[in-house]
Each structure stands twice: as C-alpha cells, then as structure tokens.
Amino acid sequence: MESKALLLVALGMWFQSLTATRGGVAAADRGGDFIDIESKFALRTPEDTAEDTCHLIPGVTESVANCHFNHSSKTFVVIHGWTVTGMYESWVPKLVAALYKREPDSNVIVVDWLSRAQQHYPVSAGYTKLVGKDVAKFINWMAEEFHYPLDNVHLLGYSLGAHAAGIAGSLTNKKVNRITGLDPAGPNFEYAEAPSRLSPDDADFVDVLHTFTRGSPGRSIGIQKPVGHVDIYPNGGTFQPGCNIGEAIRVIAERGLGDVDQLVKCSHERSIHLFIDSLLNEENPSKAYRCNSKEAFEKGLCLSCRKNRCNNLGYEINKVRAKRSSKMYLKTRSQMPYKVFHYQVKIHFSGTESDTQTNQAFEISLYGTVAESENIPFTLPEVSANKTYSFLIYTEVDIGELLMLKLKWKSDSYFSWSDWWSSPGFAIEKIRVKAGETQKKVIFCSREKVSHLQKGKASVVFVKCHDKSLNKKSG
C-alpha cells in the first residue's frame, strides 16, 4: 500500500509539473504576468523552416539568447488561421523561407495556437482575442525587457490569424510598424466593431489582401469590407484563377478526393502565395489600382497612378495612409509569378446600325517591341453605333512598347439568319490604349483612313499613329 501511495504522489507531482510548465520551463519561473499565455512562439531558422525547434518564452530571458534572436534586425510574426487537422498547413514553411530569403538577417517567429484553432469555427473565432492578448504580451515583454523597437515588428496574419494580429496590435504599448492581413476571416467579423477585428488603428500601417469574398456579407470565407489603410482585391477578390469549379472536377478526376480541402481553400490561401510572390520576385512587383468598384475596374477606368492611385501588392507596398480605406484592384495569373500587365482599350464604333447587340465577343492581339500576345478574348455587354466603349485587357507577358494591334469581332455561338444574310459592322478610325504599368498612352490608327470591322469576318489591323503628339506618357 505504501508503494502505491508513493506512486500516486509521484504521478500527482508529475501531472502538476506538466500543467505548470510550457516549453520545459516552470510557470513560476516565468513570472505571474505570463502564466496565462497558451500560445507558443517559435523562432524558426533559415536552415529549418518547417520545425519549431526553439521557443521564445515570455518571462524567461535566457530563452531569447538560446534561440539566437537578432536584436538589431526586423522581426516577422506569422499567425496561422483556423485548422481542421490541428497541424500547420504547408504554406507556413514556404512563407518562412521566403521571408528569410528576402531578409536573411531577420527573425521569423511562428505563433502556435493550434489547440485553440482546431475547435469549431465559432469557438476558434472567439479565441482570437486571447491569442491577440498572448501576442501583445510577448511583444510588450520584448520591448520592455530587451528594449526591442516595435518599429522593427511586422505581423502577418492569415484568416482568423489576421484578426488575432489586429487585436495584438491594438494591445501593444506602442504601435508595431506593420500588420499584413492575408484574407482576414469573414464569418463573425464582417459586422464586428474595430476592437474585435483587424482595423487601420492596429499598426502604423495595415495592408490587406482579399482573395475569397464570394457570397453574402458575413457568409463569405474572407471579409468583404476594407479593414486596412490599403485593401487590395486581386481579380475582384471573389474567386482566383485556377480555383474554379471546373478545376476542382479535373483535380478530383485525376487525384481523387484527397485534395478537395485544398480546392475549397484555394482562393482563401491565394493571399499567402501572392505575398510570397512579392517576396521572391522583388524586381517585378504586381501593381494594383485604386477604384470605386470592380465594375469600373473591369472597364479599364482606373489605371491611373496619379496621387497614389496605384500601389505595389505585397512586401514592397508604398505605405500610404489615406484618411479612409482605399480599395484597389488588379488581375493576376493562376500561378507564380502572378504579375500581369494591364491595358485600358477605348474604341469608338461609327456606323448606321440601328440595333443594339448584346454580349458580343471580340478578340484583340497586341504586338510590341519585346513580345506579342494574341487572341485575347473580351466581351462587351452591348455594342451600338456612334458610341465609345472602354474595357480592360491584360497580358501574362511583358510585350514592351506597343507597335500594332489586331481586332476581331467573333460570330455568335448560335446561328443567326440576319448575320448570315448581312454581317453587321462598324467603322473604326482610331483605338486608344493606356498601359497601366508604364502609364503610357498610345493611339492606333487604321492603315487606311477608316477600317471596317465586320462580325465574323477577318481581323482589322491598326498601327501606331505617326503623329507624335498623339502618343504621350500620362500620370
């Protein structure tokens, strides 16, 4: 009996030590202010971006030296989002590696709140306040204990982690330099007050990428409203290229159901990969443009860089703090590198056609000094005589300075007796093109005085006008 009693006492002491320690350090040794911190702070290394091999423990000063924290460099704090598996997702080491490649001497800390993030979504959403408090306590401790400047701190939060980052920023003794929200979660936060979610007040500068806002407000995976100083909506912020239903069916057919969860979060997670792209391809940042609506952007009406109307996506963003949040838009490719080249095209259709034709399909081909991009499809909602139409197109390659273009009006997909009897057509004298990335405006003229574009017929060629006054650079 005595041996059993001793065993029970020993087990009790062992269990008590487990509940009072974290990272191998007794809670009492950490100080009373830090006992309630459940989140873990792993300083990952360039050599091992996938494992949490060394933890910075609030209240334990030697842990900072043991992990070789660099006090003279930037610090990135990465905060993950909700998880089904209770494990880190594959993007975490990719982001860590990209941060170290861009800033080799920096500190990249990964916040582990997996046990709280694995609960039912509403429960995990509620835990973001506690996680934010944990992160704020850690940052305040680093600032007070080691005089580490918060100007060197950049928080990066994905999904629920974006709101945890915002709450952390609101609770630090001084503002951190920057918070990047990577598609902040929508449910439970779309209508939340600023103190409970990411907001512009949470850091000196807050930039946000919105990549999966499809659905009604409050039900979309990503938050729809702007919550930063600069809010960027790639491809309108709804679905991302390569993440559509057709792609899902193809992947399921090829690989089975194992990758379904990846497809569901494809657009949501694209925010992370866009930011990674900005770290790895610093020479060619993607450019976004301020616009009142995505509909106006699709018409090509917003490709201006005057008065901070355009900005870089991702790490090299210009830290413009407007009085109110600015919504910015851009197109991207379906895979890295994501950068594309935007063009506004304006065409005036002249003629005697009395009918208005709807949903008309066209193709345009651009030819430049470096490359060419042919048969770019676009659709005009309506086409009428003696009206000017503006629309947006983009190329996946840099074609250089524009020299020539071709325009084709495609036949309807259905048979039309009127088109068979007499193809409708318009006279076009000039086509105006503005390049978003270079801000150059070019006017293209018909080789003859006027070109006649007919539905279902051959392409019409336009060349750069000779009058130099017509071709200029505009802000």
UniProtKB/Swiss-Prot annotation:
Residues annotated as signal peptide: 1-27
First-tier enzyme category under EC: hydrolase
Coiled-coil ranges (or none): none
Gene3D superfamilies found in the cross-reference section: alpha/beta hydrolase, PLAT/LH2 domain
Reactions mediated catalytically: a triacylglycerol + H2O = a diacylglycerol + a fatty acid + H(+)
Protein keywords: Calcium, Cell membrane, Chylomicron, Disease variant, Disulfide bond, Extracellular matrix, Glycoprotein, Heparin-binding, Hydrolase, Hyperlipidemia, Lipid degradation, Lipid metabolism, Membrane, Metal-binding, Nitration, Secreted, Signal, VLDL
Localization in the cell: Cell membrane; Secreted; Secreted, Extracellular space, Extracellular matrix
Membrane topology label: Peripheral membrane protein
EC number: 3.1.1.34
Region (Important for interaction with lipoprotein particles) residue spans: 417-421
A Pfam family the protein falls into: Lipase
Positions annotated as glycosylated: 70, 386
Post-translational modification: Tyrosine nitration after lipopolysaccharide (LPS) challenge down-regulates the lipase activity.
Binding site for Ca(2+): 194, 197, 199, 202
GO biological process: chylomicron remodeling; fatty acid metabolic process; response to glucose; triglyceride catabolic process; very-low-density lipoprotein particle remodeling
Subunit (UniProt): Homodimer. Interacts with GPIHBP1 with 1:1 stoichiometry. Interacts with APOC2; the interaction activates LPL activity in the presence of lipids. Interaction with heparan sulfate proteoglycans is required to protect LPL against loss of activity. Associates with lipoprotein particles in blood plasma. Interacts with LMF1 and SEL1L; interaction with SEL1L is required to prevent aggregation of newly synthesized LPL in the endoplasmic reticulum (ER), and for normal export of LPL from the ER to the extracellular space.
Task of the protein: Key enzyme in triglyceride metabolism. Catalyzes the hydrolysis of triglycerides from circulating chylomicrons and very low density lipoproteins (VLDL), and thereby plays an important role in lipid clearance from the blood stream, lipid utilization and storage. Mediates margination of triglyceride-rich lipoprotein particles in capillaries. Recruited to its site of action on the luminal surface of vascular endothelium by binding to GPIHBP1 and cell surface heparan sulfate proteoglycans.
Family indicated by similarity: Belongs to the AB hydrolase superfamily. Lipase family.
Name of the protein this chain belongs to: Lipoprotein lipase
The species this protein was found in: Neovison vison (American mink)
Gene symbol of the encoding locus: LPL
